Amino acid sequence: METILSLKNLDKRFGRVHAVNNLSFDIQKGNVYGILGPNGSGKSTTLGIILNVVNKTSGEFSWFDGNLSTHQALKKVGAIIERPNFYPYMTAIQNLSLICKIKEISTEKIEEKLKIVNLFERRNSKFKTYSLGMKQRLAIASALLNNPEILILDEPTNGLDPQGIHEIREIIQKIAKNGTTILLASHLLDEVEKVCSHVVVIREGVKLYSGRVDEMSASHGLFELNTNEPKNKLISILNNNSNIGSVREEGDLVVAYLTTEMEATDINNYLFKNGITVSHLVKRKPSLEEQFLDLTNNN
């Protein structure tokens, strides 16, 4: 499979701030990738580096299996990394025509791209009459004008109402089905889960996970426990079990994440032998949100 983008040991410092820390991952053709992390985790900085907007401190990245220079490769890239900025008194057609002129590309695809983002009926409306969601959709249309092989989006639904969020996500999925590779940055786990096939989880510039979204939630499960004994005693004994990767308190319960397969009867016997009688014991699969929190809290 063709590698659209490859990052190797990418690093960026802003003074004392280590924004991107030895980051490596590959983007394969035809997939939808999400860079997921809390605000300030280095997502936008990473996108800025690969788009030649931000200078890297060290490391390297290459486009299209290294066969093209960054300048040549960016002609095959569509990107939105800032708020949409169009002329308010110009129509959608006029604004996109101007972009085509600046990029020195044909205007023949304008109506096609407006249909993709569901703005064809408003093609002759002035930009100032658009809602925030419509403005974002027009920005996506502008990024598609050069028929890019990869579309890069930075927080594409940020600030939108639920309807606007739903529309943008549907458009992203539609574009992906047409064969365009997509890389988006988001702090919303729900967004990545619904839209992306692959995810790179980062925190403070460090990669915590890279792989398929569905494999991120594929684990050996977790135990929810409670006891009348002191909680710190239960937690200490659980932490001493080699089958358990991490333990944390959630309200009245103690949650233990498994690293290998283990049945409820096994953990019950183990605790009983160590002087703990449980009043509540349930085994279940963790949600993607719980997996994400476990990653970010324990790395």
Which role fits each region the language model picked out?
Residues 222-295:
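Short, charged/small-residue-rich alpha-helical element at the C-terminal edge
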Residues 200, 294-297:
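Short low-complexity, flexible loop/linker segments enriched in glycine and/or proline
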Residues 92, 213, 285-289:
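Structural motif detector for alpha-helix initiation sites
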Residues 11, 297-299:
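C-terminal end-of-chain micro-motif
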Residues 169-255:
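ABC transporter nucleotide-binding domain
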Residues 18, 31, 106, 123, ...:
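Residues that cap or initiate secondary-structure elements
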Residues 2-5, 12-184, 189-203, 207-209:
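ABC transporter nucleotide-binding domains
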